[in-house]
A protein has these predicted regions:
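N-terminal binding-site loop/beta-alpha segment at the start of enzyme catalytic domains
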Residues: 1-86, 104, 116
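Glycine/proline-rich, positively charged
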Residues: 103-148
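A short, structured active-site edge motif that brings together acidic residues
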Residues: 84-96, 117-126
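Short active-site-adjacent helix-start/loop capping segments
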Residues: 69-70, 85, 96-98, 130-131
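Feature marks short, surface-exposed loop/turn motifs that line or immediately flank catalytic pockets
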Residues: 39-42, 66, 96, 124-129
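Short phosphate-binding loop-to-helix
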Residues: 95-105
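Short acidic, gly/pro-rich beta-turn/loop elements at beta-sheet edges
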Residues: 45, 98-100, 133
C-alpha cells in the first residue's frame, strides 16, 4: 500500500476515502467508491481506468454493453497495482434470459477483461424492457423500481 504520509492533507484525505470499503455478509469487502466506464470509448476507458487506479481508486465498473471491457482489463493490468487490490465489476446484458446465455456472456467478459477473475457480476438493469416499458399499466411499478 502507498505511503500516504508524504501526500498533502487534501490528497491524503482523498486517498483515504477511496480506500474505504463495505463489508458484505460473507465478509468480503467492496470499495465504497468506484470508477464507472459507461459511455466511455475504449480509449477513454483505458486512460481513465489506468489514471484512476494509479491515483487511489480500487473499484472499476464496466459491462458487456459498454463495449470497453478489453480496454478496462488492459488498464488494470498496466496500472502497476496488483490485480488482487482492484475490485472489478461487470454486467451481463439484461436481455439474456437463459442460463447458458449468462454463462456465455460471463465467459466472454472473462476473456475480454483478461484478468483471471471478475470480483462481481451483475445483471445489467434487470427489468423486462418490452413488458415493463411499453405498458402504461406498469407505470407505477416501473417508477417504484427504477433504482432497483
Amino acid at each position: 500500500m502507498e505511503d500516504v504520509t508524504k501526500k498533502s492533507d487534501e490528497s491524503r484525505l482523498r486517498y483515504v476515502i477511496l480506500q474505504e470499503t463495505f463489508t458484505l455478509q460473507n465478509k468480503l469487502t467492496i470499495p465504497k467508491i468506484g470508477l464507472g466506464t459507461w459511455q466511455s470509448s475504449p480509449e477513454d476507458a483505458y486512460n481513465a481506468t489506468k489514471f484512476a487506479i494509479q491515483n487511489g481508486y480500487r473499484h472499476v465498473d464496466t459491462a458487456a454493453a459498454y463495449k470497453n471491457e478489453e480496454a478496462v482489463g488492459k488498464a488494470v493490468r498496466d496500472s502497476g497495482v496488483a490485480r488482487e487490490e482492484i475490485f472489478v465489476t461487470t454486467k451481463v446484458p439484461a436481455e439474456l434470459k437463459t442460463y447458458q446465455e449468462a454463462v456465455d456472456s460471463i465467459d466472454a467478459s472473462l476473456k475480454k477483461l483478461d484478468l483471471g477473475y471478475i470480483d462481481l457480476i451483475l445483471i445489467h438493469a434487470p427489468r423486462p424492457w418490452k413488458i415493463m416499458g411499453n405498458n402504461p399499466e406498469n407505470k407505477d411499478f416501473y417508477l417504484e423500481n427504477i433504482d432497483v
